[in-house]
Amino acid sequence: MTTVKFKYKGEEKEVDISKIKKVWRVGKMISFTYDDNGKTGRGAVSEKDAPKELLEKLEKK
């Protein structure tokens, strides 16, 4: 599966694209929420670093 690598509060994180629930654009950044073992995690990645699967989820909404 495809994963998204991002930094959140200075910490490197990686999340599987299948766990991502909601995706939206903020300027040139792609923000998203994901299922973090029952909790809701948040993340953001620049548009140029986002995998194409994440961009496809953005287009579908």
Swiss-Prot record:
GO molecular function terms attached to this record: DNA binding; RNA endonuclease activity
InterPro entries on file: Chromo-like_dom_sf (IPR016197), DNA-bd_7a-e_arc (IPR003212)
Main location: cytoplasm
Pfam families, alphabetized: 7kD_DNA_binding
Entry note: thermal dependence: Hyperthermostable.
Keywords assigned: Cytoplasm, DNA-binding
GO cellular component terms, semicolon-separated: cytoplasm
Subcellular location: Cytoplasm
pH and activity: Highly stable from pH 0 to pH 12.
Region (Disordered): 37-61
Transmembrane segment boundaries: none
Biased composition (Basic and acidic residues): 45-61
Stated role: Can constrain negative DNA supercoils. May be involved in maintaining the integrity of the genome at high temperature.
Subunit description: Monomer.
NCBIfam families: Sul7d
Family under the similarity heading: Belongs to the 7 kDa DNA-binding/endoribonuclease P2 family.
The protein's name: DNA-binding protein 7a
UniProt source species: Acidianus hospitalis (strain W1)
